[in-house]
Amino acid sequence: TGKYPFICSECGKSFMDKRYLKIHSNVHSGNTFPCTECGKSFAAKQNLKRHQKIHTGEKPHKCTECGKQFLQKNKLDRHHLSHTGVKPFSCFECGEQFTWKHLLQYHQLSHTGERPFVCSECGKGYKTKASLALHCHIH
């Protein structure tokens, strides 16, 4: 609760706004918006419209610095940090900073030694899913 006080009685998922809970309820009632290309369904029509751009290749948000284009504005906003040097994600162990959350999470494995991606064939562990996928080609 607290920041997300509106809770779905069907699945327990919580929302910060009552409107989002109402939209989410479409998932349980079957009142969703399916993609005609791939069949994936969405609780909100605007989410379907955003998804459909994946199939058209449309990337309407363009970086004014380098010209790179993005499907979603929030991805462009995060990309802008690569030009400013701002790194909002800090390691609590050593203070090293990162532009992307997933890079911080990968870095934190260097402190713990954790290798969460394990080969089902030989049991060898890897820090990333990509490293495991490369390894799996040897079997």
From Swiss-Prot:
Xref: Pfam families: zf-C2H2 (PF00096), zf-H2C2_2 (PF13465)
Zinc finger (C2H2-type): 6-28, 33-55, 61-83, 89-111, 117-139
Domain of life: Eukaryota
Protein's organism: Xenopus laevis
SMART domains listed in its UniProt record: ZnF_C2H2 (SM00355)
Known function: May be involved in transcriptional regulation.
Gene3D superfamilies found in the cross-reference section: Classic Zinc Finger
The keyword Nucleotidyltransferase is annotated on this UniProt entry: no
Protein localization: Nucleus
GO CC aspect terms: chromatin; PcG protein complex; transcription regulator complex
Protein name: Oocyte zinc finger protein XlCOF14
